[in-house]
Amino acid sequence: MPATCLLHTMLTLPSPSTRNLRSIQMPRARTFSSPSRYRNGFEHAGCRCQGSTLSQIYSSLGYSGLQASQVNEGYEHLIHMLGHSREAMQLEAGAGVAIREGFKVVDQFLKDVQHYYNSEAFSVDFSKPEIAAEEINQFIAKKTNDKITNMVKDLDSDTVMMLINYMYFRGKWDKPFDAQLTHKADFKVDEDTTVQVDMMKRTGRYDIYQDPVNQTTVMMVPYKGNTSMMIIFPDDGKMKELEESISRHHLKNWHDKLFRSSVDLFMPKFSITATSKLKGILEDMGVTDAFGDTADLSGLTEEVKVKVSQVVHKAVLSVDEKGTEAAAATTIEIMPMSLPDTVILNRPFLVLIVEDTTKSILFMGKITNPTE
């Protein structure tokens, strides 16, 4: 199968990021993740898994029927395509393999993860958990420009290998907000809680769609380059219904029905960090062998029988008037004379950072309280 066809297959299949949104929601709390990173983490591991362990991983990712070589080649092509967006934004994605000193790993595994997943291998002394955690955290912090720190904690001294995946995104708004228009405003967290936020304002031409069936407003706020923020803003009191029903079909339908219109957009500044332990979620999705004594990870090592103990995911996003980096250019936008739509994000909403060319979801999150 050609790489471009395979990539299309991988991107159009249901993904854990949308198919199992209910699994990762945390009521009354912020939720944030990088679906492409935790998906890549198991593609990374699946690179050399065998038998039912591999089958379960691929089934959870929507890759049933694909061979490991096809998935590897598809992901390699995806990384290449994402690389074309890097001039106008800073997008760094990669992986690492922390290996116990003296532990023998199958050479082909290291070659494959380096070639297909841009992965770096390094040795650590897991028999000294605190020192090992510090070294791994330094690796992650360096790769994410110090945005993700202290991710690894409470290491088991019996650990023989840790697979690491990271993504760092720093984008400039295509049309920045004017900081002089930012003002204090109320944000309704829930029926009992209202907080004051720094509310940004901009009037401009945006792609927008108001879904009467799902009682949701969807709009795209573009970054420079090939990346946009998709804002999903349910009507008051409809967030729970949306979270319980949202799927990849909804995202595609909304995207297809977007149209360009004048919009008065009010959006709070926010910064969000979330850490998730994904073992329970993955087990609910059918990935069980990898965590048990029946795990077949013989493609990683022939030395001893090993299993996956935990999968930890951490993601960070900051949003302000300039995006996440100051923009020096001044732009003038020609507006039609018709009255603009008004979108005021003054209650919880969902955000997705989407790479426009591949339709990859780089990050996704639920903003419940912008002040936290």
Curated annotation (Swiss-Prot):
Name the UniProt record assigns to this protein: Alpha-1-antitrypsin homolog
Q: What is known of its domains?
A: The reactive center loop (RCL) extends out from the body of the protein and directs binding to the target protease. The protease cleaves the serpin at the reactive site within the RCL, establishing a covalent linkage between the serpin reactive site and the active site of the protease. The resulting inactive serpin-protease complex is highly stable.
Q: Among its keywords, does the record have Secreted?
A: yes
Q: Where is this site: Reactive bond?
A: M337, S338
* PANTHER family assigned: SERINE (OR CYSTEINE) PROTEINASE INHIBITOR, CLADE A (ALPHA-1 ANTIPROTEINASE, ANTITRYPSIN), MEMBER 1, LIKE PRECURSOR-RELATED (PTHR11461:SF363), SERINE PROTEASE INHIBITOR, SERPIN (PTHR11461)
UniProt entry tagged with the keyword Signal:
yes
Q: Name one GO molecular function term.
A: serine-type endopeptidase inhibitor activity
Which PROSITE patterns does this one have? SERPIN
SUPFAM superfamilies in alphabetical order: Serpins
Give start-end of the signal peptide: 1-19
**Localization per record:** Secreted
Q: Which Gene3D superfamilies match?
A: Alpha-1-antitrypsin, domain 1 (2.30.39.10), Antithrombin, subunit I, domain 2 (3.30.497.10), Serpins superfamily (2.10.310.10)
State the similarity comment. Answer: Belongs to the serpin family.
